């Protein structure tokens, strides 16, 4: 489902419809509801994917050079480990942009670097392919993420909203 409101309704409102109608959520903040951050994370990833042309532009990639851009899932087998890439862009010039899309109420912590290193290590691609890590976030990052100089690009999505 690509419509953000419909996705939110099906995942959050519909399962709680009876409680909502009985007034059990009156006076409660949405952000305090169970699973709220997970739902918002999915919504944010969907928002990023719906604005993929802007992401490609910010990465300074010519849209005509893109041969693949979508989320990517690599199944675990005997020879390879599994991994899930939030958003991956492959160009005809043997470059893959491995994008980690992070939503958090707090600034993104330095642990994102080790998480990304592990994903890229697990990703099976030919040796000649360049893998460029990209962080797409909202609500900031801690200074140590910048200091690590790990990511080829860091996109603060709140600047686009």
Regions found by a protein language model. Name each.
Residues 2-161:
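A cross-kingdom feature that marks ATP-driven nucleic-acid transaction machinery
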């Amino acid at each position: 489902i690509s419509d953000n409101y419909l996705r939110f309704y099906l995942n959050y409102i519909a399962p709680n419809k009876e409680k909502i109608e009985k007034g059990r959520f009156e006076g409660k903040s949405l952000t305090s509801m169970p699973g709220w951050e997970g739902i918002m994370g999915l919504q944010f990833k969907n928002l990023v994917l719906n604005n993929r042309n802007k992401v490609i532009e910010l990465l300074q990639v010519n849209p005509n050079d893109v041969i693949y851009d979508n989320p990517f899932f690599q199944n675990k087998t005997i020879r390879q480990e599994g991994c899930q890439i939030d958003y991956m862009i492959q160009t005809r010039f043997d470059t893959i942009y491995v994008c980690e899309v992070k939503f958090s109420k707090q600034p993104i912590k330095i642990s994102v670097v080790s998480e990304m290193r592990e994903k890229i290590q697990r990703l099976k691609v030919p040796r000649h392919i360049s893998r460029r890590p990209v962080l797409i976030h909202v609500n900031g990052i801690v200074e140590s993420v910048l200091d690590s100089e790990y990511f080829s690009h860091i996109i603060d999505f709140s600047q686009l909203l």
